[in-house]
Amino acid sequence: MKSVLYLYILFLSCIIINGRDAAPYTPPNGKCKDTEYKRHNLCCLSCPPGTYASRLCDSKTNTQCTPCGSGTFTSRNNHLPACLSCNGRCNSNQVETRSCNTTHNRICECSPGYYCLLKGSSGCKACVSQTKCGIGYGVSGHTSVGDVICSPCGFGTYSHTVSSADKCEPVPNNTFNYIDVEITLYPVNDTSCTRTTTTGLSESILTSELTITMNHTDCNPVFREEYFSVLNKVATSGFFTGENRYQNISKVCTLNFEIKCNNKGSSFKQLTKAKNDDGMMSHSETVTLAGDCLSSVDIYILYSNTNAQDYETDTISYRVGNVLDDDSHMPGSCNIHKPITNSKPTRFL
């Protein structure tokens, strides 16, 4: 049985490679069939895909066809003198969607994040990077050539990535995208401020009299501003985040404050909350006061979902001594006054 099958395959191969036994003929109506070509007014057999005409027909012998070699192809009936070369390997910003074989050319298309600037018969000839939507913008569609269309995130949605793929996402529940910390202290001298620093996981305000340090862990909103100003021996300071990242509800944003007086006082106390209007947002705080230089301290911490319809907030406060008015003067930085970011809640403006 195997020998019979082998002979049958060999017979078919002979038909393809040798162009059958039929001789070229003169067409009665002057037209050749679709699988034929005309040469010297004779209709001759074309070579099938995957082969080429190693010898054209004459009056007695039909076309002789030879298989294409590696890296070459023919994709249709032909009487070409040689097979066509496949396209080269795909570029680094492309993916191969069809490999080179004897009947098909290699096809390369653009990788994710790219779009085709120049289309060819065998895939894309030139891929370029898609536009990346900035923070606060999401992908809303694509142009006719495949570039990204960016649109601002509407109310109730947000985006905190720079991406050519991410869309605006619904604002998550029971979380926050903004943290505002206000610290008011008395008494402090007019010349006490020396510098402010931001160091990533630890924000600090240093003065000749005291140091305010805030350590934070697992907080997705990123702290980006701080200030310190003094008026009539009442100092006002604050720390603020941006609004482009939401807190991961599986993690607890933990803030640890230390207000340390730069004297030899040995007192040390951990403050308890004076006010706790917090709800379902995931956060935790501790406040430590070291030294004896301050008689009164107010600390307000506000967690906000600025995209929520009802402007969701959690407010935490701590107090030592008298109630201090932290709304009576414009915040500044080392005696250089500057306005607070427009995104600050009205409670602290």
Curated annotation (Swiss-Prot):
Belongs to the orthopoxvirus OPG002 family. TNFR-Cys repeats lie at residues 31-66, 67-108. PROSITE patterns: TNFR_NGFR_1 (PS00652), TNFR_NGFR_2 (PS50050). Residues 1-22 form the signal peptide. Keywords: Disulfide bond, Glycoprotein, Host-virus interaction, Inhibition of host chemokines by virus, Repeat, Secreted, Signal, Viral immunoevasion. It holds the Pfam family TNFR_c6. This is Cytokine response-modifying protein B. Residues 161-349 are annotated as: Chemokine-binding. Residues 1-160 are annotated as: TNF-binding. The keyword Zinc does not apply. Coiled coil: none annotated. Induction: Expressed in the early phase of the viral replicative cycle. SUPFAM superfamilies: TNF receptor-like. SMART domains: TNFR. Inhibits host immune defense by binding to host TNF and various chemokines in the extracellular space. Binds host CC chemokines (beta chemokines) and CXC chemokines (alpha chemokines). The N-terminal region is similar to host TNF receptor 2/TNFRSF1B and binds host TNF. The C-terminal region is called smallpox virus-encoded chemokine receptor (SECRET), and binds host cytokines. The keyword Glycoprotein applies. It comes from the Viruses. Homodimer. Interacts with host TNF, LTA, CCL28, CCL25, CXCL12, CXCL13 and CXCl14. It comes from Variola virus. PANTHER family: TUMOR NECROSIS FACTOR RECEPTOR SUPERFAMILY MEMBER 1B (PTHR47386:SF1). It is found in: Secreted. GO terms for molecular function: tumor necrosis factor binding; tumor necrosis factor receptor activity. The gene is OPG002. CDD domains: TNFRSF_viral (cd15839).
